Regions:
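Conserved glycine(s) of the Walker
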Residues: 29-30
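Conserved P-loop NTPase-based nucleic-acid remodeling module centered on helicase motor cores
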Residues: 51-157, 211, 448-452, 481
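Conserved ATP-driven helicase/translocase motor core recognized via long
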Residues: 172-361, 464
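Non-catalytic alpha-helical coupling and interface elements of nucleotide-dependent molecular machines
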Residues: 43, 72-80, 108-119, 137-149, ...
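Short, glycine/acidic-rich hinge or "gate" loops at secondary-structure transitions
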Residues: 82-92, 149-165, 466-467, 494-504
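Helicase-core coupling region on the C-terminal RecA-like lobe
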Residues: 169-179, 468-511
Length: 511
């Protein structure tokens, strides 16, 4: 007896020839659906596909092993129904050699196949965690000893400013954190150079372009949008026959100020909009001829008090200085940050050299060396474009399937893009995950990659489609309702990058 798939699960299983993002909540049958999709791809139709023409990437080796086993078991089940099927017999054999793998293992495969494109010994090995930790410590010690010996004023000022306790307290951690973050970018040196350029540009326009200023302004616009919605509701209550009509002029004035904050595009426009957001005392309400509903009066009054408190908090947090004062402060601190970038870059070069001496690579190396194989840098403009090797790999895979996509980072995104067929006009990447379960930001995962697609892909049939699986087949209704009650209250776009709504909540899929 076949599985009774839901409508959404069938869509995931049967959709083809597109980039497909699947937002799969906990207990929604994600793995079963993924396996069924693969089985259908290699068994359905007059010309069924081959398992070796699929690239299936999982987050852990254990997940890859489980996926391979489940696919093999599903093929064997099909073979029992049709034992003479030569294609299925071949798939049962080839599943052991198929690219069902972690991204690190796939990168290692690329390096083994294309080591001639790189300046590395083909006999390299991947160092274990303990070995790399010791080597990293040796390199850091050597680096700091060297810099102390130079008596460089910028370095000495940096140490004096940021060292804690005796000796180098904390300096090595700062250096390694910047190095580690740079490695989460596809081209680390370019990221460091871009940071230097940003620090060197001290114009007002440059201030507005900085990442932290954009974050601040986006937060302001988001809050102002929420206030505008609440004030529109308050204005509606004021306009009703038994509403507090005397409050309406002030509420409309507040709404106008909130709308101005929604439109801020730079720090100067924010200062002007926020400074002008004042809250004069509400007019007295007298209902001689048309008594005012006390509940409506209270709702409007409380709404305004709540927004006033939030606006005052925002002013206290963000209206701390003029643009000129901020730029002066940044100029004063930029020397230390530039020194930190130099130290991180120096550490990267030394660490790389030590690893090459020992013919070692670490997991960062696997990904970045794979990018060297898959991309070539244009001489003019420095743009990175997929290489011939990338084009060959793109031709080998009919589809790329990525599990736990919410835990991908920018490096992995660049790798996936290089071996996909999107640049040829035939997108073929299947991504499944749940941004609500993203727990690896401390490892520099970028759940915003998932969110960008979630917000830009359409639910309609298209080349860039998203499908949501929110039915839970694992837990009882009472458990789901309790879970939803908690997350409706605590998961907001500001806190978890996505709002927990009726659409994204867990719904019972089994009685």
């Amino acid at each position: 007896m076949g599985v009774n798939w839901t409508k959404e699960q069938r869509q995931v299983i049967e959709s083809r020839d597109r980039n497909l993002l699947v937002s799969a909540a906990a207990g929604s049958g994600k793995t079963a659906v993924l396996v069924e999709r693969i089985i259908r791809m290699i068994t359905d139709g007059e010309r069924p596909g081959d398992i070796e023409r699929l690239l299936v990437m999982t987050f852990t080796k254990a997940a890859a092993s489980e996926m391979r086993e489940r696919i093999h078991d599903a093929i064997e089940k099909k073979l029992k129904e049709d034992p003479g099927n030569e294609h299925l017999q071949q798939q049962a054999i080839m599943v052991q050699y198929a690219q069902i793998t972690t991204i690190d293992s796939f990168c290692l495969h690329i390096l083994r196949e294309h080591f001639d494109c790189l300046d590395i010994d083909p006999a390299f090995r991947v160092g274990d965690e303990g070995e790399m930790l010791l080597l990293r410590g040796d390199v850091m010690e050597e680096l700091l000893e060297d810099w102390y010996g130079r008596h460089d004023p910028a370095f000495e000022n940096f140490v004096e400013t940021y060292a804690s306790g005796k000796a180098d307290g904390g300096i090595d951690d700062y250096i390694y954190q910047v190095y580690s973050f740079s490695q989460s970018n596809p081209w680390p040196k370019e990221w460091i150079d871009e940071c230097r350029r940003e620090l060197s540009d001290t114009s007002v326009e440059a201030l507005d372009r900085t990442g932290w200023m954009q974050f601040l302004l986006e937060d302001v616009r988001r809050q102002a949008s929420e206030w505008a919605g609440q004030l529109q509701e308050a204005a509606r209550l004021c306009s009703e026959e038994d509403g507090p009509g005397a409050y309406l002029p002030m509420i409309l004035s507040d709404l106008s100020n909130a709308e101005k904050l929604r439109e801020v595009s730079g720090y100067d426009s924010f200062v002007q909009a926020a400074s002008g957001f004042e809250f004069p005392k509400l007019a007295a309400v007298r209902g001689k001829h048309s008594p005012v509903n006390p509940d409506k009066k209270e709702k409007v009054s409380e709404c305004r008090k709540r927004i006033k408190k939030a606006v005052e908090k925002m002013k206290g947090q963000f209206l701390f200085a003029s643009e000129e004062e901020i730029l002066a402060d940044l100029a004063g601190s930029s020397e230390a940050v530039l020194m930190l970038l130099t130290l991180a870059e120096d550490f990267a070069g030394r660490f790389e050299a030590k690893k090459r001496e020992r013919n070692l690579v670490d997991f960062n190396d696997l990904e970045h060396l794979a990018l060297q194989v898959l991309y070539r840098e244009e001489k003019e403009g420095g743009e990175h474009r997929p290489s011939e090797a990338a084009d060959l790999l793109a031709g080998q895979f009919d589809e790329i399937l990525v599990d736990e996509y919410q835990d991908s980072n920018l490096v992995q995104e660049a790798l996936i893009r290089a071996v996909s067929r999107e640049r040829f006009g035939t997108p073929n990447v299947f991504m499944v995950g749940d941004v609500k379960q993203s727990i690896y930001k401390f490892r520099l995962a970028r759940p915003e990659l998932f969110l960008e697609k979630y917000h830009s892909y359409t639910k309609e049939d298209s080349l860039y489609q998203k499908i949501e699986l929110h039915q839970n087949f694992r837990s009882r209704r009472q458990v789901l309702e309790s879970t939803n009650d908690v997350f409706y209250r605590i998961m907001t776009e500001n806190l978890g990058s996505i709002s927990y709504t009726e659409e994204t909540a867990l719904h019972p899929g089994a009685s």
